[in-house]
Amino acid sequence: SGLPGQWFTGPAQQVIGPMFAGYKPEDSGLDIGDSAITETYGIGGFAMATAPAIVALVGGTVEEAIDFSRQMREITLGENPNVTIPLLGFMGVPSAIDITRVGSSGILPVINTAIAHKDAGVGMIGAGIVHPPFACFEKAILGWCERYGV
């Protein structure tokens, strides 16, 4: 959030994606892993166009993977020049999520993540796409405004 020592949370979301054989959506838990943190660096869902074959694991189409990478540019401050996307003219992956851009556009970061079983100890039962709740960004904007007197 750019506010040291502060985290803004919201309700965990359901991951949407293919399940491994023998599992069904009602077996899955909510997204509570650390995959969202990787998105702040620009890897994972933000970089889907770098490896469109990932759709075989997380679901969707190659076109959607490319669109996710393009769309994330609308809510970030820049690009990471250390990780480039050949399919998009070697642009850097979108990096540094801007809470105000999320707030004004309504576009939520896209996250590639594992689907964990709802029962502890079972492990990964699929993979998919999830978005953090908008409430996280609303709270972050309010916290930022309070901190900086805006």
Model-derived regions: residue spans:
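Anaerobic metallocofactor- and corrinoid-dependent redox/one-carbon enzyme cores
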Residues: 1-150
